[in-house]
Regions:
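Acidic-aromatic/histidine active-site loop/patch
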Residues: 108
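Cytochrome P450 heme-thiolate monooxygenase catalytic core
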Residues: 1-8, 75-85, 100, 116-271
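Alpha-helical structural context
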Residues: 38, 111, 158-159
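Short, histidine-centered active-site or binding-site loop motifs used for metal coordination
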Residues: 49, 112, 246
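N-terminal membrane-proximal hinge/A-helix region immediately C-terminal to the signal-anchor transmembrane segment
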Residues: 1-103, 118, 122-130, 150, ...
């Protein structure tokens, strides 16, 4: 049967697109659970933009077929993640298609296997022990802030090779500011719904995001420039790996590609 016809025959979530988009932004797990209960383990959604006409699967065997099948029936178009462009740019692995996507994955995946994962695990345990050692008996702890501190320290050390210093503190502080804009459903709507992406000054959610992102961009490009000038092939952090990588024609990654991949790793690692 024609794939387009098969897709057309799938049960489709019936609520209006704006309501679905709001539910997706504010309560994504409830939205998917409720849709599965009403429409079954394979259903289609209709939202605006890149989330229009998407098919969701919850059956484990169907998911396995999509992820591991060798017949190339299923693609992973980067456009499906277009809603993340304001955060990640458009040259990170999540936004790439086809051969470019596979090539970038092959470059990155060795950093998340075997000995590398064990090193990251040891680092997480050390950072956690050091943090907990500073707690006092009967002291009230904001656990979310403590866990965020661990996450960001791990990211900055494994991705950038930064352990301390002015740029470490600047990137960490600015990243926290940008991430904080996604913590409220109301603020998130201004970041992810195109019609609400209006720069009304630094006091507006979108305006504040643009200004925070601009500062973070400058910090990342400055770090990339410093690392290119002082490239050390024996360093093991991911930024060093990406700077030293070459494609089949011997071309390296551009500053924009490096920046977008770093943003992807920063946000994905934090989540």
């Amino acid at each position: 049967m024609n794939q387009n016809l098969m897709t057309a025959l799938l049960p489709t979530v019936k609520s209006p697109s704006p309501i679905q988009l709001w539910q997706w932004i504010t309560e994504p797990l409830d939205y998917m659970d409720n849709s599965e209960r009403e429409y079954g383990d394979i259903f289609k959604i209709r939202m605006s933009g890149v989330l229009n006409n998407c098919v969701f699967l919850s059956d484990p065997k169907a998911i396995q077929q999509v992820l591991t099948g060798t017949d190339k029936q299923f693609a992973a178009p980067g456009s499906i993640n277009g809603i993340l462009k304001p955060f990640l740019g458009d040259r990170g692995v999540l936004l790439l298609d086809g051969g470019e996507h596979r090539q970038r994955r092959q470059l990155l995946m060795p950093q998340f296997h075997g000995d590398k994962i064990r090193v990251y695990t040891e680092l997480i345990c050390k950072l956690t022990r050091d943090l907990v050692a500073g707690w006092q008996v009967d002291e009230t702890i904001n656990l979310r802030e403590q866990m965020q501190s661990i996450s960001l320290s791990v990211i900055l050390q494994t991705v950038f090779g930064l352990y301390e210093g002015e740029r470490y503190e600047q990137i960490q502080a600015k990243l926290i500011q940008v991430i904080s804009l996604t913590e409220s459903p109301v603020k998130s709507s201004f970041l992810f719904i195109p019609a609400l992406q209006q720069d009304l000054g630094a006091w507006s959610p979108w305006g504040r995001f643009l200004r925070d992102r601009e500062v973070l961009d400058r910090l990342l490009y400055a770090e990339i420039a410093d690392r290119r000038r002082n490239y050390q092939p024996d360093r093991s952090d991911i930024l060093n790996l990406l700077i030293g990588s070459k494609d089949a024609e011997g071309n390296g990654m551009s500053d924009i590609e490096l920046h977008d991949e770093l943003m992807t790793l920063l946000f994905a690692g934090h989540e």
